Structures are given as structure tokens and as C-alpha cells.
């Protein structure tokens, strides 16, 4: 009687994974670097995208079958493509914030909206200002909720849509107010 061949001896099953250049993707990359995918009879094909919405745009072309993405793309994916959330890697809700520079006038007004006594800013300190954001991201959602709490909409401010890395670079270069 011969032993059954191991999974590694067979041709590995190609598994297309979507990822973004952030810490959640490290586990896929590290597993591939260590050969752990091959040990389990898999061949990870990691496809990197700048945003979760970019990942979703690649879904109809079947460029990936599993991966990690953000909250807003998960919801959009479920609505548009019947995708499933199978697990939450970590809760990043506490890091989603509206960011300003130390000299921003919004920092001088606290509690303008009594429903949010710790919220900084007022319609007068925010209206007409420039917001850097990534379309359909948790950042975009948080910014919209911030404006709503101040009785404003996206039409009351200047919206500059950019990829996440561009948002950081632009803000660091002094572009934008929020």
C-alpha cells in the first residue's frame, strides 16, 4: 500500500487574493514569502490595489476571489456583487478621524452642535474649506458625517478626491484644510 500523495506534491491550487498596501495584507505576503501557501497546496497570487473600490472594479473580471478590504467597499460589494464578509481582521473605527493642522480655526470651536458636545468646528469655520479624501472610503463616510453634524453638505466645501497616498502627500505639502 502506497501513502497518499501530499497536497504539496500535487499542482498547487491558484488562489487569487486582493490586497491593499497596508498592514492587513502583510499576512498574505508573509505566508507566500515563507512558502506556507505551497505547504497547504495553494499558490497565492496577490493582486494589489490602491483602494477598496479599485478592488471591486476588478471583481467582475474575476481577478480575485478572496482578500481584505475596507468597510465601505464591503458594503458596496455586497450590494453590487453579492459578496460576503467572512471575518473582521481588526476594528479600525478609532483611527477614522477628520484631520486638521494645528492652526485650523475649527479647533477653536467646540460643542457648536449640542448633540455632539466634543465635536470641533462650526459651519463658519468649515464652510468653503478644502477636504482631501478618497471617494467611497471610510474616510469619505466620516467626512460626510462630520459635515452633516455641522449642518453642512459636500456642496458647502471644496472636495478633492485622491488616492490615499496622494491625500497624505498633499496634506503633508500644505494642500487642503481637512
Model-inferred region functions:
Residues 10-154, 158-161, 177-178:
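Short, glycine-/small- and polar/acidic-enriched structural segments
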Residues 1-13:
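Short, low-complexity disordered leader/linker segments with a strong preference
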Residues 166-178:
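Pocket-lining segment of extracytoplasmic ligand-binding domains
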Amino acid at each position: 500500500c502506497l501513502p497518499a500523495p501530499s497536497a504539496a506534491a500535487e499542482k498547487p491550487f491558484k488562489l487569487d487574493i486582493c490586497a491593499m498596501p497596508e498592514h492587513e495584507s502583510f499576512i498574505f505576503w508573509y505566508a507566500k514569502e515563507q512558502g506556507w501557501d505551497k505547504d497547504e497546496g495553494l499558490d497565492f497570487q496577490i493582486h494589489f490595489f490602491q483602494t477598496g473600490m479599485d478592488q471591486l472594479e476588478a471583481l467582475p473580471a474575476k481577478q480575485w476571489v478572496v482578500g481584505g478590504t475596507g468597510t465601505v467597499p464591503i458594503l458596496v460589494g455586497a450590494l453590487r456583487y453579492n459578496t460576503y464578509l467572512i471575518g473582521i481582521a481588526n476594528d479600525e473605527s478609532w483611527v477614522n478621524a477628520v484631520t486638521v493642522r494645528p492652526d485650523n480655526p475649527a479647533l477653536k470651536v467646540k460643542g457648536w452642535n449640542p448633540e455632539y458636545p466634543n465635536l470641533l468646528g462650526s459651519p463658519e469655520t468649515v464652510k468653503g474649506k478644502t477636504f482631501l479624501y478618497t471617494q467611497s472610503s471610510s474616510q469619505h463616510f466620516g467626512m460626510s458625517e462630520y459635515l452633516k453634524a455641522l449642518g453642512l453638505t459636500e456642496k458647502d466645501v471644496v472636495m478633492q478626491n485622491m488616492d490615499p497616498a496622494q491625500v497624505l502627500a498633499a496634506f503633508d505639502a500644505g494642500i487642503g484644510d481637512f
